[in-house]
Amino acid sequence: MKKIITTGVLFASLILFTTQQTKAQTLTAEDIKAQMVKEWERSKAYTIDYLNTMPANKYSFKPQDSIRSFAQQMLHLAQANLFFLSLATDLVSPSFGSDREKSPSAQTKDSVMYYVTASYDYCINAVKNSDISKWGEKKKLPFGGYEETRFALLLKAIEHQAHHRGQTTIYIRLQGIKPPQERLF
């Protein structure tokens, strides 16, 4: 009899626990939007760590002649942030001009810091002010014939900036400097 009661109590506890877990795992559209904002804020802080770690006199460093310098990588990241988020949200982005990464005057540490932080500020505000009910709509990219949802474009933007920030890890290491500690949260 004691075994039956114990089994019953355990079974009831399992049902109660499962029910509570199901309730706790429900995400609203606003939860998803808030998480996306949090991700952009984290990415901004992490990228600023990278910008601060590389010495100002090494922003022009290229591991090889055929690839972008550290400054060019970061300026490319900034321009792509604006491109993806303006396409995903239809919110007008600041104009950095085309090919900012090729402009020598933009490649100083102060200029790169300005453009990169401005791009992240735009991304954070674009997500905050976007209409999440439209995130499922398809958008045609102006190249390659690609068509993606607005939400997919937001995810591609996160992936793209992480990719280019990650590429600069080796630039920092080749200067004999330890790169910033990863910021997962």
For each of these PLM feature ranges, what is it?
Residues 37-41, 48, 58-101, 139-185:
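Short, contiguous alpha-helical
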Residues 29-30, 36-38, 87, 106, ...:
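Short leucine-rich amphipathic alpha-helices used at interfaces
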Residues 23-45:
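Short N-terminal segments immediately surrounding and downstream of signal-peptide cleavage
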Residues 104-141, 148-160:
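Acidic/histidine-rich alpha-helical segments that form the ligand environment
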Residues 1-27:
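Bacterial Sec-dependent N-terminal signal peptides
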Residues 46, 50-51, 85, 122, ...:
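Well-ordered alpha-helical scaffold segments within catalytic/enzyme domains
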